[in-house]
Amino acid sequence: MSTATGGLLLVHAHPDDETITTGGTIARYRARGVPVTVVTCTLGEEGEVIGEQWAQLAADRADQLGGYRILELTRALDALDAGPPRFLGGAGRWRDSGMAGTPSAEHPRAFVNSGPEAVEALVEVLLDLRPRVVVGYDPNGGYGHPDHIRAHRVTTEAVRAAAERGWDVPKFYWTVTDADMLRLHTEALARRTAAGLPGALPRGWRLPAADELACVASDTVTTTVDVAEVLAAKRAALRAHATQITVAPSGREFALSNNIAQPVLPEEHYVLVRGRRGPAGPDGREHDLFAGLDGPAT
């Protein structure tokens, strides 16, 4: 029996990725009544844990982090009103492969070694839900993590395969970050810090070096989604991933375990890679992932 939604489906590698890059988009479309499904490929077992409370859960200790991150993902999706988690192949089918060059990639369940089974699992989801919009990663997986790169390949292959088996996804996007917007907000943080103004860099954090945060040239971005009205939901979702993310007291930035400040942007960015581009605004970009599709997004 089909449970087709015609909504938005996003494919992410680990718990927290859905919030960092697309949390505002999820919250915006849910606020408009659009069905949203987040498919997560691993449990994020190899993540570095912030603080001492849950440090013993790490992969090199009790190796229980993945189970706890299911809870964090559940809380984050609840904050975004996106429903319960959905894991590719079922929770625990594939394991976090770790950063490039680490031994964790040799684990028999490492996602980088998932093969055709992962593609088929996602095809089944696409044929079941028949989303009108799918969001995945670019070929570099954003910042080059092996699981992100694998998620890109799995999503791309699954979208193509689903088209041959009855559901041609109308619009397929990559989630990216606009380099100009990232620089604008990072420079604003630097000025606040230098002047000792409210919202300065938290103690122990540092500003990102040039090209340290993943981003793409602004002229490659096709679509901007305004998420300013739902930033409270995105911040709540970021805080839900407490083993991985710290949100600054100002709420304007967050940091991973490396303490590099990343801005919580008022917009999220995409590149349309499959489907017809919809009507554009004065900036030459779409401002709705469903732009140009028949019927409203809500």
From Swiss-Prot:
InterPro entries named among the record's database cross-references: GlcNAc_PI_deacetylase-related (IPR003737), LmbE-like_dom_sf (IPR024078), Mycothiol_biosynthesis_MshB (IPR017810)
EC number: 3.5.1.103
Source organism of the structure: Nocardia farcinica (strain IFM 10152)
Any Pfam family the entry gives: PIG-L
GO molecular function, one term: N-acetylglucosaminylinositol deacetylase activity
Signal peptide span: none
Cofactor binding note of this UniProt entry: Binds 1 zinc ion per subunit.
Protein family (similarity comment): Belongs to the MshB deacetylase family.
Gene behind this protein: mshB
Residues binding Zn(2+): 14, 17, 148
EC primary class: hydrolase
Region Disordered: start-end pairs: 277-298
Record-given protein name: 1D-myo-inositol 2-acetamido-2-deoxy-alpha-D-glucopyranoside deacetylase
Reactions this protein catalyses: 1D-myo-inositol 2-acetamido-2-deoxy-alpha-D-glucopyranoside + H2O = 1D-myo-inositol 2-amino-2-deoxy-alpha-D-glucopyranoside + acetate
Record's function text: Catalyzes the deacetylation of 1D-myo-inositol 2-acetamido-2-deoxy-alpha-D-glucopyranoside (GlcNAc-Ins) in the mycothiol biosynthesis pathway.
Cofactors that this protein relies on: Zn(2+)
A GO biological-process term: mycothiol biosynthetic process
Keywords: Hydrolase, Metal-binding, Zinc
